[in-house]
């Protein structure tokens, strides 16, 4: 057995070591396609490195809108955007209190309203209240507003306690570019207008 102090250790010169490292790098490159920036063109890779959020946004954003009721209008339900978590994204616009559909496709449309009222005094006449909320579609295919989603309720206010009722509905619809989505509400004076209680929106699926 060769004594430990006489073990033969091959020497690798600097040039040979560089060649080995270069070969190893070339072998590993095909498996690096999943790394950020690899497999992209130089300009695309540079953009992804400098603006990663922008690169992701361009590939994932879809048309979407979320509107809230204007609390300053007590006798009408006016929708507003770009405030208190309300927004218009990727082509949606708000015109004449209606959402304009930017592109044809399948959209999930939704809306919610909350109504409240005070108790009646014993001397007052307690007549029932009719509450309703409806999402309507106006399209070039129809000469009138077509109901898409609707809820109705008769409320009989009590003598002792205030009352509170909510309505929510949502469903998917095939819509066409240029379609108009709007709402119609009965019982507007009883609406609880806040960003979390009265809202209306749609987003592409």
Curated annotation (Swiss-Prot):
One Pfam family this sequence matches: TNF
InterPro entries: TNF, TNF_beta, TNF_CS, TNF_dom, Tumour_necrosis_fac-like_dom
PROSITE patterns recorded: THD_1 (PS00251), THD_2 (PS50049)
GO biological processes: apoptotic process; cell surface receptor signaling pathway; cell-cell signaling; defense response to Gram-positive bacterium; humoral immune response; immune response; lymph node development; negative regulation of fibroblast proliferation
Signal sequence range: 1-34
Residue intervals of the THD domain: 63-205
Gene3D superfamilies to which the protein is assigned, alphabetical: 2.60.120.40
Keywords carried by this UniProt record: Cytokine, Glycoprotein, Membrane, Secreted, Signal
Source superkingdom: Eukaryota
Keyword Signal: yes
Functional summary from the UniProt entry: Cytokine that in its homotrimeric form binds to TNFRSF1A/TNFR1, TNFRSF1B/TNFBR and TNFRSF14/HVEM. In its heterotrimeric form with LTB binds to TNFRSF3/LTBR. Lymphotoxin is produced by lymphocytes and is cytotoxic for a wide range of tumor cells in vitro and in vivo.
Family: Belongs to the tumor necrosis factor family.
UniProt name for this protein: Lymphotoxin-alpha
Lineage: Eukaryota, Metazoa, Chordata, Craniata, Vertebrata
């Amino acid at each position: 057995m060769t004594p430990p102090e006489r073990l033969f250790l091959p020497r690798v010169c600097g040039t040979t070591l560089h060649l080995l490292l270069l070969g190893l790098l070339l072998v590993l490159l095909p498996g690096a396609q999943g790394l950020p920036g690899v497999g992209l063109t130089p300009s695309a890779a540079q953009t992804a490195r400098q603006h990663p959020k922008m690169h992701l946004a361009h590939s994932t954003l879809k048309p979407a809108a979320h509107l809230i009721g204007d609390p300053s209008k007590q006798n009408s339900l006016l929708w507003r955007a770009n405030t208190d978590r309300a927004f218009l994204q990727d082509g949606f616009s708000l015109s004449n209190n209606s959402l304009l559909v930017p592109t044809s496709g399948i959209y999930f449309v939704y809306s919610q309203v909350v109504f409240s009222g005070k108790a009646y005094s014993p001397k007052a006449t307690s007549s029932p209240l009719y509450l309703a909320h409806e999402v309507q579609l106006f399209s070039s295919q129809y000469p009138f507003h077509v109901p898409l989603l609707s809820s109705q309720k008769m409320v009989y206010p009590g003598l002792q306690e205030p009352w509170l009722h909510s309505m929510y509905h949502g469903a998917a619809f095939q819509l066409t570019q240029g379609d108009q989505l709007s709402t119609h509400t009965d019982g507007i004076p009883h609406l609880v207008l806040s960003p979390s209680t009265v809202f209306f929106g749609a987003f592409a699926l």
